[in-house]
Amino acid sequence: MAPAVMASSATTVAPFQGLKSTAGLPVSRRSRGSLGSVSNGGRIRCMQVWPIEGIKKFETLSYLPPLSTEALSKQVDYLIRSKWVPCLEFSKVGFVFREHNSSPGYYDGRYWTMWKLPMFGCTDATQVLNEVEEVKKEYPDAYVRVIGFDNLRQVQCVSFIAFRPPGCEESGKA
């Protein structure tokens, strides 16, 4: 009874006939000489290339010189303003490595040791910087990184090196 009462709302669709010619579509045409005056030549001369050897890349801000205390404080302020939870990690080897296996695993340097607990409820960058100083005192020969963790989306949003140990080959060249 129901199929006879209801009207069909389906429409027929023409079968696919292949790609249509674009000749009928409006096209803006540029003159051939219009791109001849555009040049990046002036900018290219002042650009520098990052050296491929001798300077290792760490995290988000690895292409900048080591952060001053003021710059580090501004980065942590941004992290807190973004409602991310600061977390500190440290490692004596600051890089990914594979020692006993060719496939990636837990012990290949991607996971660092967490310093204490994530700083839930942290509202001031000086709290984080004080913890960075504690890590530096306890482990002076370890790399220290700050992570911003979004506890709503449950993802790591930012990670950067807060301290490089003195004497490491990269600490003065960044």
From Swiss-Prot:
GO terms for cellular component: chloroplast. Residues 1-45 form a transit peptide. Keywords: Calvin cycle, Carbon dioxide fixation, Chloroplast, Photorespiration, Photosynthesis, Plastid, Transit peptide. GO terms for molecular function: ribulose-bisphosphate carboxylase activity. InterPro entries: RuBisCO_ssu, RuBisCO_ssu_dom, RuBisCO_ssu_N, RuBisCO_ssu_sf. It comes from the Eukaryota. It is found in: Plastid, Chloroplast. The keyword Acyltransferase does not apply. GO terms for biological process: photorespiration; reductive pentose-phosphate cycle. SUPFAM superfamilies: RuBisCO, small subunit. Belongs to the RuBisCO small chain family. RuBisCO catalyzes two reactions: the carboxylation of D-ribulose 1,5-bisphosphate, the primary event in carbon dioxide fixation, as well as the oxidative fragmentation of the pentose substrate. Both reactions occur simultaneously and in competition at the same active site. Although the small subunit is not catalytic it is essential for maximal activity. The basic functional RuBisCO is composed of a large chain homodimer in a 'head-to-tail' conformation. In form I RuBisCO this homodimer is arranged in a barrel-like tetramer with the small subunits forming a tetrameric 'cap' on each end of the 'barrel'. Heterohexadecamer of 8 large and 8 small subunits. HAMAP family: RuBisCO_S_bact. This is Ribulose bisphosphate carboxylase small subunit, chloroplastic 1. It comes from Triticum aestivum. The gene is RBCS1.
